[in-house]
């Protein structure tokens, strides 16, 4: 094949691949879309709406631990600090991505809740979700362009097309594209930083010191923005600094510059931002519970007495090492189940001719190893999570793996049949990597076409129409709803929501006291399928998750057995199981004689709102 014909073929493949990936994204966003299903995405969305309204970096999702932290801070300096539940400072998310979402929300008018309320008679999908998913989809498409240019720059266009094809039809990558999470944006930043790093390595090989400083400076800036998008990415930055310290001479000089950039652009803003809730050190300790606490960070976030939760420090470093190696074990799945990803480890033993490829290989390895340690210490085991960093290394791992497969084929002396065998190999790898997704795609399209008029939400546990409609009408903006789904209440109902604590005494003795001191009223309790959906662990899992409020969570399941909904399970809990407890019993809160005695079935027995006042007129 002549060079002209080969260039035309590559150009055609490039356009076909771009059209395929764009079409898949649009199908997800327009035809088979079911709304957001990630609590962090909803939380960031409601914070972004607050920003778009001019309320600053505030939240309507209130965590008990933050109430305790803010109250302790206010007690120490009552003249300087006040606990304002109407403008409750957000201290759990890095600031960059919510501001990007805020721009999208402002441009589309979704900062005005009343003007953009759902028409529950026509749709089950909140269009605000589609706005949030559109932002992540745009960044996903941009990441594909950056990945293509980076891989083509390192190897050639055939490897680039193959790598992007792997990513574009990976089910996990496409799920991230509509997840509303910041990972697609973070992927863009990582790829931009690696572009700068390649230029710095090339300049270093030519002894152009000024250019090395320029490109590394840009690389460090991109990494700083990455850290301000997700604090976990500081581990990636640390890996990059380690690489720079050993690769560039004089050793340590460029790494020291990177440390200075990180301190100025990341550490200082983070310290100022986290000061209201006890500072960076407190958030650091809280974060460790996500990996090493008894039940993860959720248990800690749902308590207003953090001193009562013990941190298991036994065999700390041994467990850290074990959790780190578990990240290696899950590498294939967490990087989209792409066939060539594991071959990156084989590429470590191959010496590439270009110094830039060699340098990037070790830089990516250093960043990934540090990220694995960070995910073991602070992260989660879920494949789709705001703290999952493995996805950021997928393009490089897949590219090096693909290159190694092609190198192995070239060494087999296939002669004129090389291109045909390479094409068949790529096709086979694509089928293996995306077979399940492609197999399910026709069914998803069929369901999407037949349900496109109203849509199917991610129920259980989420049902936006119930919150955007009835719950919003039943509740008041100035009062708080205690719920097991506060991120959804804050986003869909536009109401202040307290994450329901696991301990009854935590609520009645600590939180109620703080609310009374601040003149903040609680208007009711909302129980959703988040608490009572039976998973593999059954009732034991419900009890473990809901804690002392388990009877309230299980009441919905019991009510499903009684057609007239006349059973009140909480009535049985008029005394505490522990005779020494000074907490008020559960029945004093939610029963026929309790403070929140009015039971409202927002979505049958699946979603029950226990209100202080009679709001039955809105439940029609």
Stretch-by-stretch model annotation:
Residues 176-177, 183-187, 226, 235, ...:
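Hydrophobic/aromatic-rich transmembrane helices and adjacent perimembrane loops
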Residues 227, 234, 246-346, 435-439:
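Membrane-lumen/periplasm interface segments of specific transmembrane helices
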Residues 1-29, 36, 255-262, 355-361, ...:
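Start-transfer (signal-anchor) and selected internal transmembrane alpha helices
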Residues 11-20, 212-221, 238-242, 260-267, ...:
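Signature aromatic-anchored transmembrane alpha helix within multi-pass, membrane-resident enzymes
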Residues 242-245, 322-361, 365-368, 372, ...:
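Hydrophobic, aromatic-rich transmembrane alpha-helices
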């Amino acid at each position: 094949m002549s060079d002209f014909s080969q260039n035309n073929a590559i150009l055609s493949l490039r356009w076909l691949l771009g059209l395929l990936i764009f079409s898949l994204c649009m199908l997800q966003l327009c035809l088979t879309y079911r709304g957001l299903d990630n609590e962090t995405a909803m939380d960031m969305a409601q914070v972004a709406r607050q920003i778009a309204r001019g309320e600053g970096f505030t939240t309507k999702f209130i965590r008990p631990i933050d109430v305790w932290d803010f109250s302790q801070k206010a007690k120490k300096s009552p003249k300087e600090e006040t606990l304002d539940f109407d403008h409750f400072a957000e201290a759990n998310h890095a600031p960059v991505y919510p501001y990007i979402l805020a721009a999208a929300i402002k441009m589309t008018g979704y900062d005005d809740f009343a003007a953009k309320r759902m028409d529950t008679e026509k749709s089950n999908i909140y269009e605000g979700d589609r706005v949030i998913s559109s932002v992540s989809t745009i960044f996903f498409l941009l990441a594909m362009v950056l990945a293509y240019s980076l891989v083509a720059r390192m190897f050639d266009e055939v490897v680039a097309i193959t790598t992007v094809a792997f990513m574009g039809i990976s089910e996990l990558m496409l799920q991230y594209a509509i997840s509303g999470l910041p990972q697609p944006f973070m992927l863009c930043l990582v790829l931009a930083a690696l572009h700068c790093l390649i230029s710095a390595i090339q300049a270093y090989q030519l002894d152009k010191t000024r250019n090395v400083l320029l490109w590394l400076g840009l690389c460090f800036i991109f990494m700083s923005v990455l850290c301000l998008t997700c604090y976990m990415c500081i581990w990636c930055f640390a890996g990059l600094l380690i690489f720079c310290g050993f690769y560039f001479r004089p050793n340590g000089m460029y790494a020291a510059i990177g440390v200075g950039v990180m301190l100025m652009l990341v550490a200082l803003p983070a310290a100022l931002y986290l000061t209201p809730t006890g500072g960076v050190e407190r958030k650091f300790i809280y974060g460790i519970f996500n990996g090493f606490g008894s039940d993860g960070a959720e248990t800690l976030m749902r308590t207003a007495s953090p001193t009562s939760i013990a941190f298991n420090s036994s065999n700390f470093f041994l467990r850290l090492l074990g959790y780190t190696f578990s990240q290696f074990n899950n590498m294939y799945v967490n990087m989209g189940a792409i066939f060539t990803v594991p071959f990156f480890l084989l590429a470590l033993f191959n010496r590439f001719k270009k110094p830039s490829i060699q340098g990037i290989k070790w830089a990516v390895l250093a960043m990934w190893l540090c990220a694995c340690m960070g995910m073991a210490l602070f992260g989660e085991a879920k494949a789709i999570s705001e703290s999952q960093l493995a996805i950021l290394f997928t393009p490089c791992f897949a590219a090096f793996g693909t290159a190694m497969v092609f190198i192995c084929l070239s060494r087999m002396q296939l002669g004129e049949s090389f291109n045909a065998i390479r094409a068949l190999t790529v096709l086979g790898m694509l089928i293996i990597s995306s077979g399940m997704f492609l197999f399910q795609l026709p069914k998803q399209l069929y369901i999407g076409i037949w349900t496109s008029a109203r849509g199917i939400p991610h129920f259980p546990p989420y049902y936006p129409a119930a919150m955007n409609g009835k719950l919003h009408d039943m509740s008041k903006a100035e009062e708080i709803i205690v719920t097991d789904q506060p991120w959804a209440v804050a986003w869909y109902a536009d109401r202040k929501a307290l994450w329901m604590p696991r301990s009854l005494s935590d609520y009645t003795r600590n939180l109620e006291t703080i609310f009374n001191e601040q003149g903040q009223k609680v208007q009711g309790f909302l129980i959703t399928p988040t608490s009572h959906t039976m998973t593999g662990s059954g009732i034991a899992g419900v009890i473990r998750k809901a804690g002392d409020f388990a009877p309230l969570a299980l009441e919905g399941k019991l009510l499903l057995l009684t057609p007239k909904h006349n059973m009140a399970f909480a009535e049985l809990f008029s005394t505490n199981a522990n005779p020494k407890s000074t907490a008020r019993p559960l029945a004093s809160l939610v029963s026929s004689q309790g403070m929140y005695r009015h039971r409202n079935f927002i979505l049958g027995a699946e979603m029950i709102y226990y209100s202080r006042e009679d709001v039955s007129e809105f439940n029609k």
